[in-house]
Regions:
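Active-site-proximal, structured, solvent-exposed surfaces of multi-pass membrane proteins
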Residues: 3-6, 55, 647-786
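Hydrophobic alpha-helical membrane-insertion signals
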Residues: 5-81, 480-499, 503-518, 522
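Membrane-embedded helix bundles of polyisoprenyl
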Residues: 23, 112-129, 135-217, 229-249, ...
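Active-site lumenal/periplasmic loops and adjacent helix-entry segments of GT-C-fold
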Residues: 29-167, 191-195, 278, 289-301, ...
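Periplasmic/ER-lumenal interhelical loops and adjacent helix-loop junctions
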Residues: 47-59, 91, 226-227, 234-324, ...
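Extracytoplasmic/lumenal acceptor-recognition loop(s) of multi-pass membrane glycoenzymes
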Residues: 81, 85, 462-487, 499-568, ...
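Contiguous transmembrane helix-bundle modules in multi-pass membrane proteins
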Residues: 179-180, 199, 330-492, 739-786
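Membrane-interface helix-loop-helix junctions at transmembrane boundaries of multi-pass membrane enzymes
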Residues: 220-228, 317-341, 453
Length: 786
């Protein structure tokens, strides 16, 4: 059985406009709050504030200026690999390039509204084939655009790019298989791949599930010829969109966060039983803030995008559909996805079998759930027969959440308490809003289901309720951190000129921050030790743990690790004024207050060592392991860490560090080591947008150290001749120079980018020829019919 696409005038732009203006109304009150409170542009919480706003502004300026190496990204990282996961392939980012970089923070909300509109339009286009009623197809698009997943992931922003584009690829697959339409599917495959390679891996898995479920339900019928053509178009689309894939893949293979396999029972069972409860209730209750745990306290729940909630209608329509159409492909898809959600290894299949738990693939079955719900509602007799029972079941299951608020237990003092909730008020707000949606839907069903404009009434109700629950979610997320984030704009956007005027520009140096927001380096265009990005140079991930710094999604060296600042050429620390007393109480060696801005007190490092210097001694890995990780930076200020091969090659230039020096880790010894490194500094150092240059004038041959993350993309020359780059200190770089005056140049080229760009360019050319052939064939067929 085949389902030809519903033939009626498209209402795409009507859905687009409905979703866009609903999103405008959703964000407008919070934008007004920020403006009235003196905060300027809309800011939210967590990742949105610390990453998305500054990523968009920084990347906008970086792309316009050109370059390949970003000094403002942590200790320095390749720009492409650092930002391809977040925005570099997104069409929404490239659209934002028409906006001046300085105005990008104000463009974030319009972009969010646009993404929701595109998502709603895409959901509608996909659903109209299956729902076969324009009004109910429009509702499907609105449900998808304002699902709990979309509202939750405003927090992450760039996840909504994927939500927006995916329905178009799924609709193109249906067109290719059912209607034998050629040419569109490769385009959408390419666009989704280039938009986000990480999510595309999950999309590929889902498309396979969807394809086989459609075939099992006899909606997809294709012979060998059509199957080969579909495989060809898939491969062509992947080739067209692989421009960022190869560079990202080469980098991710070295990133420890991407290599985290399961073992034993981990394949089959989640480590905490409450994880199952959280998954179950994710379809019933509207989502809480991404950084809170209320209903369940154990398990991996924060920042996981664990929600499959649909506004107003909830899961009732999906349950009724699955009972009514047991052999429909949608039922198969939803059942397979439920199984995937509850089995760890199947859930991780959407993330290349990484054992870290996420539910960031739920938007795909949510789209099918929207289609199934509207399919049912568009058929009055079927809905009349099945929906009431499903609605009663949904109501009952939702009410069971109250148990968590009243179940008895014991507190730390042995007293009887009721409820297992950390913040009951938050729970009751979420539960109350969810129940309000159920009641409204039940009343509308009872009084309006037989009205001629029932579909339009329910669509209006869904959009109105989306404003209510969406605003509650935004409020729970945004204002819970208001005491922390209310000064975001003052400490970032508004401080750019003040900080630039306060900091000298006489040499290259890094900065640090204390008690401030993440990623100040991007705002002030300087390398900063406090940095929040998951895809920085892999050698940063290797280096930091060796000096006592946990490096997962953040670089956050403790202030007490003061010797690390000397090693990494940190000259100034920007201390938020409300944290200055806390900073001074630490009484860290070598810091003097030298100035201030409206937002920060500036402390200068008396033990600052300019970038690029030499050593008198080397230390071995065995020696360094005898020193605690938190104190190794003190030794690395005294001696460079070399492996056995490097000792054989450069041992004649350096003395082995005596073992007794390993215990000499006093503050005075650190200051003396920094003074020695300053005295052995290069004659000049210049950071460039493709790497750096340096000049040396040493009396003897030397191994010159640079605290720049090692990367295979770097090549080096000394006096114009190629030079080998040494990986030292578990992830930083050094180069050998002869005695006398020398010019060193390090140039960064993104590994794999040239190859992948050539593949994409060639594939796009082939795709163009393919489209031309399709057009000529179509024109010929039209001519023959005449």
């Amino acid at each position: 059985m085949q389902t030809t696409i519903f033939k009626q005038k498209s209402n795409y732009w009507r859905v687009f406009a409905l979703c866009f203006f609903t999103a405008v109304l959703l964000f407008a009150p919070h934008c007004i709050v920020d403006a009235v409170a003196g905060g300027g542009c809309f800011h939210y919480a967590g990742d949105f504030n610390d990453q998305q706003i500054n990523f968009y502004q920084y990347a906008n300026a970086f792309v316009k200026n050109g370059g390949s190496f970003s000094w403002a990204t942590d200790l320095g990282s390749g720009f492409v690999n650092s930002y391809s996961f977040y925005l570099l392939g997104s069409p929404f980012f490239w659209l934002s390039m028409v906006v001046p970089a300085r105005l990008m923070p104000w463009a974030m909300v319009p972009l969010l509204c646009l993404k929701m509109a595109v998502a709603g339009g895409g959901g509608y286009l996909w659903a109209r084939r299956w729902v076969r009623d324009e009004t109910w197809s429009m509702l499907a698009g609105c449900l998808y655009a304002f699902s709990g997943f979309s509202i939750y992931n405003i927090f992450f922003n760039h996840f909504l790019d994927v939500v927006a584009l995916f329905p178009y690829m799924l609709a193109a697959l249906d067109d290719a298989v059912i209607d034998d339409k050629k040419g569109a599917f490769p385009f959408w495959v390419a666009l989704n791949l280039v938009d986000n390679y990480f999510f595309f891996a999950g999309q590929a898995v889902f498309l396979i599930i969807y394809f086989f479920c459609m075939a099992a339900g006899r909606r997809y019928e294709l012979g060998l010829r059509k199957f080969v053509r579909l495989a060809w178009e898939t491969a062509l689309g992947c080739a067209c969109g692989c421009v960022l894939l190869l560079p990202a893949g080469l980098s991710l293979l070295q990133n420890p966060r991407t290599i985290d396999p399961f073992s034993g029972y981990g394949y089959l069972f989640y480590g905490k039983s409450q994880q199952y409860g959280a998954i179950f209730y994710s379809t019933l209750l509207m989502p809480d803030a991404p950084y809170f745990k209320d209903l369940f306290q154990e398990g991996i729940l924060k920042h996981t995008s664990l929600t499959a909630y649909l506004p107003l209608v909830g899961v009732a329509g999906g349950l009724a559909f699955c009972r009514a159409r047991e052999r429909h492909p949608f039922t198969y898809v939803l059942k397979v996805c439920v199984a995937c959600a509850f089995v760890p290894v199947l859930n991780s299949a959407f993330y290349a079998l990484n054992s870290s738990y996420y539910a960031r693939w739920y938007y795909m079955p949510i789209l099918v759930l929207c289609g199934a719900t509207c399919y049912l509602l568009s058929r009055p007799a079927l809905a009349e027969q099945r929906l009431p029972r499903a609605l009663r079941l949904t109501t009952f299951l939702t009410l069971t959440a109250v148990v968590f608020a009243v179940v008895p237990g014991k507190d730390d003092d042995g007293n009887t308490v009721y409820g297992v909730l950390d913040e009951p008020a938050r729970f009751w707000a979420i539960f109350g809003m969810t129940m309000l949606g159920i009641v409204i839907f039940a009343l509308l069903w009872h009084f309006c289901r037989n009205k001629r404009r029932w579909g339009a009434i329910l669509t209006a109700a869904v959009l109105g309720f989306s404003l209510l629950y969406g605003s509650l979610h935004l409020s729970l997320t945004k204002y819970a951190q208001w005491d922390v984030d209310s000064n975001l704009i003052a400490e970032t956007y508004d401080s750019v000129e003040d900080v630039a005027a306060a900091l000298p520009d006489d040499a290259f140096y890094r900065i640090d921050a204390y008690g401030a927001h993440n990623n100040l380096g991007l705002w002030f265009n300087r390398s900063c030790l406090q940095f929040f990005n998951s895809t920085v140079a892999p050698s940063i991930m290797a280096f930091y743990p060796e000096v006592g710094v946990k490096r997962d999604v953040n670089s956050k060296p403790d202030a007490e690790n003061y010797a690390l600042r000397g090693l990494l050429s940190v000259r100034y620390t920007l201390v938020a004024k409300d944290k200055e007393t806390e900073w001074t109480d630490k009484d860290l060696p070598g810091w003097q207050r030298t100035g201030e801005t409206d937002a920060y007190a500036l402390y200068e490092n008396e033990n600052w060592v300019p970038m690029g210097f030499t050593y008198d001694c080397y230390v071995t890995a065995d020696q360094l392991e005898r020193v605690s990780e938190e104190e190794r930076a003190q030794i690395l200020c005294r001696a460079i860490l070399l492996d056995d091969d490097q000792i054989s090659a450069f041992g004649s230039l350096l003395e082995p560090l005596p073992d007794e020096e390993l215990t000499n880790r006093s503050e005075d010894a650190y200051a003396a080591d920094c003074a020695a490194r300053r005295a052995a500094g290069v004659a000049a150092f210049t950071a460039t947008d493709t790497g750096f240059t340096a000049k040396t004038a040493y009396d003897a041959d030397e191994l010159v150290f640079f605290s720049v993350p090692y990367d295979d993309g770097f090549s080096a020359t000394v006096n114009g001749e190629p030079a080998a780059i040494e990986k030292v200190d578990d992830g930083l770089m050094a180069v050998y120079v002869p005695a006398g005056e020398n010019e060193i140049e390090f140039t960064y080229h993104t590994p794999g980018l040239r190859v992948s760009a050539c593949v994409s360019a060639a594939a796009i050319a082939v795709y163009g020829v393919y489209l031309l052939g399709i057009m000529r064939k179509r024109k010929s067929q039209l001519g023959s019919k005449r």
